Amino acid sequence: MQGKVALEEHFAIPETLQDSAGFVPGDYWKELQHRLLDIQDTRLKLMDAHGIETMILSLNAPAVQAIPDRKKAIEIARRANDVLAEECARRPDRFLAFAALPLQDPDAATQELQRCVNDLGFVGALVNGFSQEGDGQTPLYYDLPQYRPFWGEVEKLDVPFYLHPRNPLPQDSRIYDGHPWLLGPTWAFAQETAVHALRLMASGLFDAHPRLNIILGHMGEGLPYMMWRIDHRNAWVKLPPRYPAKRRFVDYFNENFHITTSGNFRTQTLIDAILEIGADRILFSTDWPFENIDHASDWFNATTIAEADRVKIGRTNARRLFKLDGR
């Protein structure tokens, strides 16, 4: 399929490059560094070769979210966004941008989002899970009350917010002791991000801000296939408190969330996701440079789904969600 839009596609700046070192074997690190720092060369050639018209670029993980010092987090977020704006300006026909945000400081994050959207032309934000602040030992999740004004501005700006994974903090990772292979994208990423998304749903956030659009990668971090059970078992809880939100989890999932195919290239999983959340809320992504563009594209181009759904997922859903036809 030609003309695809891909939207979980990462880059790095020198200050955040090392954050990605632990996710690949040592003998592959040199190649990954090249992939993360390159935008205009290898990346663009692969896009051309595999029918990707547009990439929406975002900073690698955890990057800004793992900088407990507020001032430093604000500085790195702003620098990353400025670098990305310059790169996108070189090829505005091929590259768009997600803002990195210093959510250690909700007011600063709000201001940076406003700057990126209004002044730099970014199409949304991608945030790498919870943020660390102060001593770095307490994760800040975005259902907390201090983030409500931030979410109000996201809704006002009418841009999507991509909740990208990161590993849990060491003190919250004891279940993985002795099993480090379960950390990262193998399992811990999905578990951490799914719980964060459920917290957002349960908090009442989407009752207060019903026009928010949240994106989850990796075919929804396992949530599409658990929504029925989550609501079914929660309904058995007869005694208050249950949760502050007014509706079922599945209602928020189906109305406020979108999912991407990033790093999850399995047809059975895609078909189940279509049955659960609908083809209108699924978007193509590759997860470059941690996955290969040819693998993602070859699978998607050949996967056994309706051609109308392929066009939606590969292109038109993203163009609608990010309002690309008016750019």
From Swiss-Prot:
GO molecular function terms noted in the UniProt entry:
carboxy-lyase activity; hydrolase activity; metal ion binding
State the pathway, as annotated in the record: Aromatic compound metabolism
Q: Does the keyword Electron transport apply?
A: no
Assembly and oligomerization: Homotetramer.
**Top EC class for this record:** lyase
pH dependence remark: Optimum pH is 7.0 for decarboxylation.
Q: What is this protein called?
A: Gamma-resorcylate decarboxylase
Under the heading InterPro entries, the entry gives: ACMSD (IPR032465), Amidohydro-rel (IPR006680), Metal_Hydrolase (IPR032466)
Q: Which reaction does it catalyse?
A: 2,6-dihydroxybenzoate + H(+) = resorcinol + CO2; 2,3-dihydroxybenzoate + H(+) = catechol + CO2
* One Pfam family hit: Amidohydro_2
Catalytic residues as annotated in Swiss-Prot or TrEMBL = D287
